[in-house]
Amino acid sequence: MVDINQIPTRRPFHRRRKTCPFSGANAPKIDYKDVKLLQRYISERGKIVPSRITAVSQKKQRELAKAIKRARFLGLLPYVVK
């Protein structure tokens, strides 16, 4: 009979924690006029992509959302994409 304690166990898989793309020395600044940068954080339907997907820190996600909303209000970005 096989002893359970003698079966080799696998090490658990550790996913590397993503770092915030807006943190660091030469990171881009979040600006409502930088439409190209803001479009990377908007889904194809026009919704703001959550930080758990984009790996943006909580503070920078709030800044990003504010910049996207400001750009929408000024007509630089669409509210909804059909």
UniProtKB/Swiss-Prot annotation:
SUPFAM superfamilies to which the protein is assigned, alphabetical: Ribosomal protein S18 (SSF46911)
Gene3D superfamilies named in the record: Ribosomal protein S18 (4.10.640.10)
Molecular functions (GO terms): small ribosomal subunit rRNA binding; structural constituent of ribosome
Key words, A-Z: Ribonucleoprotein, Ribosomal protein, RNA-binding, rRNA-binding
Keyword RNA-binding: yes
Signal sequence segment: none
GO cellular component: cytosolic small ribosomal subunit
Keyword rRNA-binding on entry: yes
Subunit annotation: Part of the 30S ribosomal subunit. Forms a tight heterodimer with protein bS6.
Function: Binds as a heterodimer with protein bS6 to the central domain of the 16S rRNA, where it helps stabilize the platform of the 30S subunit.
Listed name of the protein: Small ribosomal subunit protein bS18
Gene for this chain: rpsR
